[in-house]
Structure formats: C-alpha cells, structure tokens
A protein has these predicted regions:
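Membrane-embedded alpha-helical bundles of multi-pass transporters
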Residues: 111-125, 154, 173, 412, ...
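Juxtamembrane coupling segments of multi-pass membrane pumps/enzymes
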Residues: 76, 182-185, 190-193, 207-268, ...
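Flexible metal-binding regulatory segments at protein termini and peripheral loops
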Residues: 1-128, 233, 249-252, 334-342, ...
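Conserved cytosolic catalytic loops of P-type ATPases
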Residues: 26-43, 48-49, 200-201, 232-326, ...
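Transmembrane helix-loop-helix hairpins at the membrane interface
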Residues: 87-241, 352, 717-722, 728, ...
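Conserved ATP-binding TGD loop and adjacent catalytic N/P-domain core of P-type ATPases
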Residues: 16, 29, 430-432, 512-514, ...
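ATP-driven catalytic headpiece of P-type ATPases
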Residues: 90, 309, 433-476, 506-587, ...
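Conserved catalytic phosphorylation-site environment of P-type ATPases
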Residues: 290, 349, 384, 397-471, ...
Length: 843
C-alpha cells in the first residue's frame, strides 16, 4: 500500500471527500484516508501524479510519503509532532482578547450599565459600528474557517468548517443588515425602530461561535497529538549516529550513512544503531525497547543484535545486516503507522454518514428557518434557530470515533510487544470465539529436555547420565541434544568413544574403553538387553505422560532409564486459563500421536486436542473450526503459514526481531503465550471504546440538532442560543478523543497481570489437580449489546453467595462463572433472565 500525506482536511467530511475522489481514479483498487494522521493509503496501479491530481481537484493537497530517498526516524517523528495546537493557541488568545472587549460593549453596557467612552454613550450607531469592527477582527483571526469552509462548498464537498462559516457568517450578515437599517432609522429620527434593531444584533454570537469552536479545535488537536505518543516514543528510540570502522579507524557517522556490511562498534551504555551480527566480544543487551522483556539477553560471537537495544556491559564489534527502513525497529514503526492509516470494518457506517452529513445539516438549517418564518416568528428568532443547527452539528465526532481508538489501541499493543498489522486485525481479534494453538514452540518450548532420570540397581543418576552422555555425544538426534545439554548443565564431561553406530530400530551403540554401550527406544532395548519389569512399567507410565523413555545399558546389562520431553512454557497453563475465563474455546493442534498430545493438552488445560495433524493438514482443520465460530490460529509462522492465513485472525508468536511475518495479521514479539489473551483483551477494549465513541457521536447529533432547531420550543419552551450550540460542538470531538485516550490506562494483562507460576522440573500430569480446580460454568447469553449490559449481568451473578466471580463478554455472548460451591443452573438462568437477557445454554 502506497502512503501519501494529505493537507487541508479539517473534519470527517473532508476525509470522506478525499477518499471518494481517489477511489474514482482508474487503477485504484482501494483507498483509506486517516484524518487523525493526515495520511492516505492507496492500492492499485494508478500513478502518484494521478492520485495527487485527484486530491487537488477535490480541494486538498497531497504528496507521496518518502518522496525523499530515505526519511530518517527523526524526520518522521517531526512530521508527527503536534504543530497545529500552538497555532490554534495563538489564534484563541487573540480571539479571546477581542471577544472580551466585544462582550463588554455589547452585553456589559446594555445589561449592567458598565461605563463606556462618552463618544459611545447613547450613540447606538457608534456602538453597532464598534461591535461590527471587533467581530471583523475576530473573523480575520479565524479566517481559516471561512477559507476552508467556502472553498469546500465551491468544490461541492461542504465540511465542518462550512457549517461554522455559514453559522458565523449568517450571524454577522444579519447583524450588519440590522446595523444599516438602524442607521436609516436614526437618520429618520425613528428612535423606537433604532431600539428594536439594537436587539437584532448578533455580532457577539458570530464572534463567540468562532472563539468557542477554536477552543474545541485546540482541545481536540492537543488530545489527537496524544494519540500518537506511542508511535513517537518508538521513533525516539532510533539512534541518530553510529560508530563505524572505516579504513581501520572508528568514525562517528549519521545513521543514514551506515550501509549493509559495514562494521560498527558499540560500547557499554550505548544503543545499538542498526541490526547486525556480533563479530567480536560478548555482552548483555537490554531489548526491552523492542520486546518489552526487561531481562538482558546475553550476546556473543554469532548472536544477532537489533537497533535501539542497549549494550549494557561489554564491548561489541558487529557487522550491519539490516539498515535504514529494513531494521526491526523501522518495521515495527511502519507496521504501527500503516495500521493507523487503515480502517476497521466498524468505521464504514460512520464514513457513510460523514459523506452526507454536512449537506443534510445545511438542508435542515434552511428548512428550520423557513418553518419558523411560516409559523409567524420574526426573522431574528428563525435565523437563531437555523444558526444553532449549523453550529451544534459535528461530523468530526463521527469521523474520529474509530481512528483515534485504533491509533491508541495499536500504540498500547506496540508498547507491550503486540503488533496489529491493520485495523481489521485489531477489530477481528476481539471477536475470537475459538483459539487454535500449535503445540511445538507455542504451548511448549519446542526444545526437548531431560525430565526424569531413573537408574537401575547398582547405578547412580550421575553414572547413568555419564553413560548416556558418552553414547549420545556422537549422535545428531534432537533427543541426543537434550541429553547432552543436561549433562553439561550438571557438570558431566564426555569420555571418548569409538565404533559409534546408529542402529536400525532407534538404537545406538559405541565402545568406551573395553565396555560396549547401548541405548535407544524401549522396543529396541527389549530385544537386545534384559530389562527389569519395574523399569518397563515406569517407561510405560512415562510414555502415557507424553514423554519419550530411553533405556541405556553397559555390556548388555540395563543401567537405567532417562525420559525426554518437549516441555510446557511456564505461562502456558495460565494463558489457557485466561482464554477460557474469557469465554474462548481452546484447541491444541499437533502432529504428535494421540497419547502424547493428550498428555500435553491435559497439562496445558486445553478444551480439545486434535492430534496427528501434519503441517499441511492444519489449514483444513482451521477451515472446519471456522464453521463453529470466529477462529484465531496461534503458531510460529514458519510451518503453519497456510493455517494462519486461513484463520479469521492469524497470530504469530515469538517473532523476536523477525516481525515481518506475512501470514500473520497479529505478531507477538515475545515468545509468551499470555500475550494471546492480552491481544484479544486489548482488541475487545478497543472495540468497546469505539462503540462508546460512535454512540456518543450519534447520540449527540440526534439529540442536539432537534434541540437546536427548536423542536421542543412549542411544548416546553426550550430554545438553544447559537453560542451554547457552538460550545457543545467544540466539546463533542474533544470528548470522543479524550475517551479514546482512556485506553492508555488499560492493562493488557488485566487481573491476571501477575507472575506465572514456574513450571516444575519434571513435567508430569497430576491427576489431583483436576479435582482441586475451582468449579466454573460458562453461560451463553443473548441480548447483551454493550459494556453496560456486561456490568449488569456481572453484578447480578456476583450477588449470588455461591458465585466467586463472573467474567462477562457481550462480544462473545458468554459469562464464565467461578463458583465456590454448587449452584443449580436454573438459579443462574433465572438471575440473568430477570435482567431481561436470554440464557440459551449453560456448559
């Protein structure tokens, strides 16, 4: 997707106009305009010039991003800086100064008798001329509203500035007419008419409208600037210089001058400038800036390092492998920025409304004036109602409702190592009903390790490990690697062997000194060595637990048994529990045999295990699961790319520095399964925030426009002064943006944000754990529409003495109830249905 910078947009109607204009360009397949970042993403074959011309023809400006060969992070950060708020603050200060003077003469003197210069006293024409002059000054200060508003109107695409310009202009125009009419009456000596026209002045309304809208614009601009804080903080991480080796000398150069293949050095305390490979030295590197992981990572020769991470202890000499826009940091920044420029499906309704909103409001204002005139009201009353309609209506609140929440939610994710590639992914993740987890590398560490050492009579554990290490030292098998790593960790050094053979039937043999060493699977060893029945029973039990038992012998006498297994990640059980507590069904996909798979599944606590699935078969399983609900597939993005692509949400876990995984729509930088429920939780919070924003934006306009038009005046006598309408409009967008900023306070790990319990050294199934688990029930509920519904159901359920807690989700339509003691399903059902929701099932 090609990115463009767009200038001149002031509200949602503007972005809708630009999007519509560019979408009509031949060759454009899709176009997405972001009012928040003043950017546009375009896909298709149309040239840059054709796209820019379309934007210019619509009345705005555009230029391709990165028109320069390469834009530094500092320049990108500068582009994101809030340049608008300082300008608005100056405009507001000047406007307020002249408005205070205007209000003194227009209201203070008339209502409270405040003193005025002698030349003005009882000189109504002079007072009117002064008010007109002060209003003109304020209009000139805020000329942007008129230039933008009427330019857009001439292009057939009226925007929010058009409403402000028409409202303030109508107030000023009618007041100017009244001033000239009053002057004529003064000349004729008709003092009654003079006093009547004095009350027809709306100069202060025109000035107040412009000033209050500027207040709102400044507050909105400041709040919008806050939404890009996460992106700007990422950009600040980028080093500005690097120390490279040129002609054998160390030279400090700009980061833009570093090229792939350059040798650079990093001393303790310095940030690593670009991605690279360590050529010399060792150190501990803090990668928290990229991964959020606070524990430093040891680096040595051959290790990879990433830009913006901090060298803490040693001297490193490295070779640059990825520079400029190819570094991990640049990819993350681009991913976050591109996601902010895309649109979520939920925004479509707001976009449709924004496209016709301003013309509809102008029409309503004209009809309002005509109706009140036909009803017998004077022109001043009718005009005030029409102006109120113009200035209270706010398309910006509609246009900002979705993008500000997407930007803040996406930034929160990036800070926590959760990268959403686009707004669609951020929305879809929250709708997940089923999570399919790949086993190897996702639930488990992906690296087999020794879990049990059971020596035969006459052998110690160390004797057995020494024998196994000597035999396995010449093997390349993954299980041999696990044995060797355990031996190294326990301080066992290998003794040289010769005549090593890998025998048919999963067996090994070698000669150590004069002793023949044998090792291998139970079936192989039973045929070659006499094995004690107790060891065979233990081997059977270990196999049932998903472990691989290996027998070892010396001179055909069994020395004992060592079990090896791919062990669970420490946080896997907790992550699965969190997903289930959120009302999500958890399934494990694996190519392992059913016995091993079920053992691992039981340890992790998943709802279902699908075993014997080859990598190419995972996609078919995901296709089947999608028939049952929205599916998120979690894998490493290597051998499960088709499954990740097929799922509604593909989540790649443990990406580390390789964040550009094409198959996944969500990338988890850390190899931490708890980030999966965190991503879903963040998505749900963002969706909830969008719903709140859209509700407020629609509710505000639906309530405000009829009130401004005077619909309730005949019944209750309610009418709205245009100045109060302008005040309401100025605050509406600010409220939407401020509500989105609340996401910055959201904890992605929620109540579960505590350290995961460390896994025991031997990974075993403890049958007693299933009996000790707290009882839970999942209720399927229809009728919940929002966060308020969730709170109502949660409060009702938790009022029951047997209920410890209730986790309610209106998106999933579930309530997961944790019970301290048994409670009848009928009681739970009645409790919820008394709140006017329907319970369809209880699991």
């Amino acid at each position: 997707m090609k990115q463009y910078e767009v200038t001149g947009m002031s509200c949602a109607a503007c972005s809708a106009r630009v999007e519509k204009a560019v979408s009509k360009v031949p060759g454009v397949t899709s176009c997405s305009v972001s009012l928040l970042t003043n950017s546009m993403g375009v896909e298709g074959t149309a040239s840059d010039q054709e796209i820019v011309n379309a934007v210019v023809a619509a009345g705005y400006g555009a230029a391709p991003k990165g028109a320069k060969k390469e834009q530094t992070a500092a320049e990108e950060e500068e582009a994101l800086k809030d340049h608008e708020t300082p300008k608005l603050r100056k405009r507001l200060t000047a406007s307020v100064i002249f408005l205070v003077v205007l209000m003194y003469f227009s209201m203070g003197h008339m209502m409270w008798g405040w003193p005025v210069p002698a030349a003005m006293k009882d000189n109504h024409v002079a007072m009117g001329m002064l008010q007109m002059l002060l209003t003109i000054i304020i209009m000139v200060i805020n000329q942007k509203f008129f230039v933008s508003g009427f330019t857009s109107l001439l292009h057939g695409a009226p925007n929010m500035d058009t409403l402000v310009a028409l409202g303030a202009g109508a107030s000023f125009g009618y007041s100017t007419y009244a001033l000239f009419a009053m002057t004529g009456a003064q000349v004729r000596g008709d003092m009654d008419a003079v006093m009547g026209y004095m009350h027809e002045f709306y100069f202060e309304s025109a000035a107040m409208i412009l000033t209050l809208i500027t207040v709102g614009k400044m507050l909105e601009s400041h709040a919008k600037g806050k939404t890009t804080d996460a992106l700007k903080s990422l950009m600040r991480l980028a080093p500005k210089t690097a120390t490279v080796v040129r002609d054998g000398k160390e030279v400090i150069v700009s980061i833009t001058e570093v090229r792939q293949g350059d040798t650079f050095v990093v001393r303790p305390g310095e940030n690593i400038p670009v991605d690279g490979i360590v050529l010399e030295g060792s150190s501990a590197v803090n990668e928290a800036a990229l991964t959020g992981e606070s524990i430093p990572v040891d680096k040595q020769k051959g290790s990879s390092v990433s830009a913006a991470t901090t060298n803490q202890s040693g001297f490193l000499r490295c070779e640059a492998t990825r520079v400029g826009e190819d570094t991990t940091l640049s990819q993350i920044i681009r991913m976050v920025s591109d996601a902010a420029a895309t649109k979520a499906p939920i925004a479509k309704i707001a976009d449709k409304v924004s496209g016709i909103f301003v013309p509809a409001v102008i029409t309503i204002a004209v009809i309002t004036i005509m109706v009140w005139l036909l009803a017998g009201k004077d022109i001043g009353f009718a005009l005030a109602r029409g102006i109120s309609v113009l200035v209270i209506s706010c398309p910006c609140a509609l246009g900002l409702a979705t993008p500000v929440a997407i930007m803040v939610g996406n930034g929160m994710g990036a800070k926590n190592g959760i990268l959403f590639k686009n707004a669609v992914a951020l929305e879809n993740a929250g709708k997940t009903q089923i999570v399919a987890l790949d086993k190897t590398g996702t639930i488990t560490t992906g690296e087999p390790r020794v879990t049990d050492i059971l020596p035969a009579e006459g052998y110690t554990k160390r004797d057995l490990m020494q024998l196994a290490a000597d035999l396995e030292s010449s093997s390349e098998h993954p299980l041999a690697k696990a044995v060797m790593e355990h031996a190294k960790a326990t301080g066992i050094s290998q003794t040289a062997v010769h005549d090593f053979q890998a025998l048919p039937g999963n067996g090994l043999s070698a000669v150590r000194g004069e002793d023949l060493l044998l090792g291998g699977s139970v079936s192989y060893m039973k045929e070659n060595v006499t094995v004690d029945s107790i060891l065979l029973d233990q081997a059977q039990k270990l196999a049932e637990e998903g472990k691989t038992p290996l027998l070892f012998a010396k001179n055909h006498i069994c020395a004992g048994l060592i079990a090896v297994a791919d062990t669970l990640k420490e946080d896997s059980p907790q992550a699965v529990d969190e997903l289930r507590d959120m009302g999500i069904r958890v399934i494990m996909l694996t190519g392992d045999n059913e016995r091993t798979a079920k053992a691992i599944g039981a340890q992790a606590g998943v709802d279902e295990v699908i075993a014997g699935v080859l990598p190419e078969g995972k996609e078919a399983e995901i296709r089947k699961l999608k028939e049952q609900g929205k599916v998120a597939m979690v894998g490493d993005g290597i051998n499960d790319a088709p499954a990740l692509t097929r799922a509604d949400t593909g989540i790649a876990i443990g990406a580390g520095t390789d964040v550009a995984i094409d198959a996944a729509s969500v990338v988890l930088v850390k190899s931490r399964l708890r980030d999966v429920p965190a991503a879903i939780r963040l998505s749900r919070a963002t969706l909830r925030n969008i719903h709140e924003n859209l509700f407020w934006a629609f509710f505000y306009n639906v309530i405000g426009i009829p009130l401004a038009a005077g619909v309730w005046y005949p019944v209750f006598g309610w009418k709205l002064n245009p100045m109060f309408g302008a005040a309401a409009m100025s605050l509406s967008s600010f409220c939407v943006v401020t509500n989105a900023l609340r996401l910055n306070l959201f904890s992605v790990h929620g109540k579960a944000n505590k350290d995961a319990a460390p896994a025991a050294e031997p990974v075993e199934i403890k049958t007693s754990e299933s009996e000790e688990k707290v009882m839970t029930k999942t209720m399927h509920i229809e009728g919940m529409m929002c966060g308020h519904c969730e709170a109502t159901v949660k409060k009702a359920l938790e009022a029951l003495p047997e209920v410890t807690s209730a986790e309610v989700s209106h998106e999933a339509g579930t309530a997961v109830v944790t019970l301290s003691s048994e409670v009848a399903d009928d009681v739970l059902k009645k409790t919820v249905e008394e709140k006017d929701y329907k319970v369809t099932a209880i699991d």
